[in-house]
Curated annotation (Swiss-Prot):
UniProt KW ATP-binding keyword: yes
Primary role: Acts as a chaperone.
Alphabetized GO MF terms: ATP binding; ATP-dependent protein folding chaperone; unfolded protein binding
Protein origin, superkingdom: Bacteria
Name the UniProt record assigns to this protein: Chaperone protein DnaK
InterPro entries: ATPase_NBD (IPR043129), Chaperone_DnaK (IPR012725), Heat_shock_70_CS (IPR018181), HSP70_C_sf (IPR029048), HSP70_peptide-bd_sf (IPR029047), Hsp_70_fam (IPR013126)
Length: 623
């Protein structure tokens, strides 16, 4: 039976894990690291780079290097967070069928397609490590991701060639990894602050049960926002000193982002750091350099309100769970941004107790996802995972009111229905507007989609009975149906979310990903062939030089001709493996005479060595 991989598809970094021989372990990538930067780059040569290699060239290729794609996953173009993303990100965020996408060199890519490229790398790294093909996966999402974002994540997995067995919440996965071996029931709080998202979840673990009691968060709050505070400060300081606004310089902004991220990390252990960016820009007076000292106290002042938001959310979630802080036995810290000292101090102060930092914040979510995969496959027995829906779901009713059908915090999977009627006499159709959120009016909540139920028999208003049913699966993905109870006519919709991708489009993207895989393999094969050819050229030239006149003129001429042919092919960067191999074979054949000459040279050297008179040897007998 093929193995199931657990994937933490993060905003900043991603991680993949597998459950084998009774434990879940992180799979290192081909570069030997346990996490892979969630960065995808498109080069001028048509190459697609993923991970560390993509991140390294970001400064010189800012408009075609995509990072933090998770922040626009399932995001509508008219949402507030979309406007902020467009203003912040150096690459082009554009509208595609009402949803956010990115434009690179004139081509539009959905967040699902970009995320799929990250997933493909994780899949290939897992296959290289395990030595077998991998298809099945469990992928994690922030607990506060809405239906659109969950659906988009699952679509990314499909495009990457994965069979997504389950979408599970990141804090739940972390709790699964942390609490699986706990025998006694205990209530824990998982504080998960990553690169772009924040979740807080209260769970009860013990005796192989992990039950979510309440969850909350902010899908647009994380380490990126800490970085942005530093960037804004640097831009402001530099403008005050030089009069130059760096916000219009994409390459400078990319350098500022890298510097801000590094400064944030350094301030986790140091009280002060220096940000030194020579030649950040230039004006008529010459080049300009940016050199600033940033203290931990200054940085903490910048992010204090953001950290404060997370503490407020902790209080709300504990209240939703019907608990008090004294009921929480452990506070488990998850996500790379929990390394920031102020975060740890404020959470510790909120509970008045030491925090549990026993889990690796970058790896624990993927480890939990792999455990969930093993549960689904039956490799781990008797484990029950009870998750909840993070936001209420309902429909728009008369007066623009949101009528909730499934309340937030309901354990999933679940199915609930409610009967509604018409608002006007002789109304023969109704439009069902599906909403997600906690506000009283429809306009203030997120619209997930709509559909029509037609053919309702003419009747006075309030007489027809229309049953609306909401069905949430274990992935937290919603299907809505409406049925006229008098006629039995029904209509349903699986909410496709704001991704706007049809099944045909997803299938097309799957094929496109496969095509790129073939192209990448051809390119890799060509690189390997080129390296071998370069080595042959070097060796042949070296041998020709060493043998000199010992190579007959005709043979030398043939070898030089084949050598020049191979060099010409190598000059063309678009040469295929087959073209290079053909010229390598021709040079190898022509070089046979070289091998013969080298052999004769070695033979003669050996013979001369054997005939050397032993002038320094004295014959003697040893008693």
């Amino acid at each position: 039976m093929s193995k199931v991989i657990g994937i933490d598809l993060g905003t900043t970094n991603s991680c993949v894990s597998v459950f084998e021989r009774g434990e879940s372990k992180v799979i290192p990538n081909k570069e030997g690291k346990n996490t892979t930067p969630s960065v995808v780059a498109f080069t001028d040569k048509g190459e697609i780079l993923v991970g560390d290699v993509a991140k390294r060239q970001a400064v010189t290729n800012p408009e075609k290097t995509i990072y933090s794609i998770k922040r626009i996953m399932g995001l509508m173009s008219n949402e507030k967070n979309a406007e902020e993303a467009k203003a912040r990100l150096p690459y082009h965020v554009v509208d595609r069928n009402g949803a956010c996408a990115v434009e690179i060199a004139g081509k539009v890519y959905t967040p699902q397609e970009i995320s799929a490229k990250i997933l493909i790398k994780l899949k290939e790294d897992a296959e290289a490590y395990l030595g077998e093909s991998v298809t099945d996966a469990v992928i994690t999402v922030p607990a506060y991701f809405n239906d659109s974002q969950r659906k988009a994540t699952k679509e990314a997995g499909t495009i990457a060639g994965l069979n997504v067995l389950r979408i599970i919440n990141e804090p739940t996965a972390a709790a699964l990894a942390y609490g699986l071996d706990k025998k006694e029931a205990e209530k824990i709080l998982v504080y998960d602050l990553g690169g772009g998202t924040f979740d807080v979840t209260v769970l009860e673990t013990g005796d192989n049960i992990v039950e979510v009691l309440a969850t909350g968060g902010n899908a647009f709050l994380g380490g990126d926002d800490f970085d942005n505070k530093i960037i804004d400060w640097l831009v402001s300081e530099f403008k005050n000193e030089t009069g130059i606004d760096l916000k219009g310089d994409i390459m400078a902004l990319q350098r500022l982002k890298e510097a801000a991220e590094n400064a944030k990390k350094e301030l986790s252990s140091a009280q002060e750091t220096e940000i030194n960016l020579p030649f950040i820009t230039a004006d008529a007076t010459g080049p300009k350099h940016l050199v600033k000292k940033l203290t931990r106290a200054k940085f903490e002042g910048m992010i204090d309100s953001l950290v404060g938001e997370t503490i407020t959310k902790i209080n709300e979630v504990i209240k939703d769970a019907g608990l008090s802080k004294s009921d929480i036995k452990e506070v488990v810290m998850v996500g790379g941004s929990t390394r920031v000292p102020l975060v740890q101090e404020e959470v510790k102060k909120a509970f008045g107790k030491e925090l549990n930092k026993s889990v690796n914040p970058d790896e624990v979510v993927a480890i939990g996802a792999a455990i969930q995969g093993a549960v689904i496959k039956g490799d781990v027995k008797d484990v029950l995972l009870l998750d909840v829906t993070p936001l209420s779901l309902g429909i728009e009713t008369l007066g623009g009111v949101m009528t909730k059908i499934i309340e937030k915090g309901t354990t999933i999977p679940t199915k609930k229905s409610q009967v509604f009627s018409t608002a006007e006499d002789n109304q023969n159709a109704v439009t069902i507007m599906v909403l997600q959120g906690e506000r009283e009016f429809a306009r203030d909540n997120k619209s997930l989609g709509n559909f029509n139920l037609e053919g309702i028999p003419a009747a006075p208003r309030g007489v027809p009975q229309i049953e609306v049913e909401f069905d949430i699966d274990a992935n937290g993905i919603l299907t809505v149906s409406a049925k006229d109870k008098a006629t039995g006519k029904a209509q349903n919709i699986t909410i496709s979310g704001s991704s706007g991708l049809s099944e045909d489009e997803i299938n097309s993207m799957v094929k496109d990903a496969e095509l790129h895989k073939e192209e990448d393999k051809k390119r890799k094969d060509a690189v390997e062939a080129r390296n071998q050819a370069d080595a042959l050229v070097h060796q042949t030239e070296k041998s020709m030089s060493e043998l000199g006149e010992k190579v007959p003129a005709e043979d030398r001429s043939n070898i030089e001709a084949a050598l020049n042919d191979l060099k010409e092919v190598l000059k063309d960067e678009n040469s295929s493996k087959e073209q290079i191999d053909a010229k390598v074979e021709a040079l190898s054949k022509a070089s046979h005479k070289l091998a013969e000459a080298m052999y004769k040279k070695d033979e003669n050297a050996g013979a001369n060595g054997g005939n050397k008179k032993d002038d320094d040897v004295i014959d003697a007998e040893v008693e």
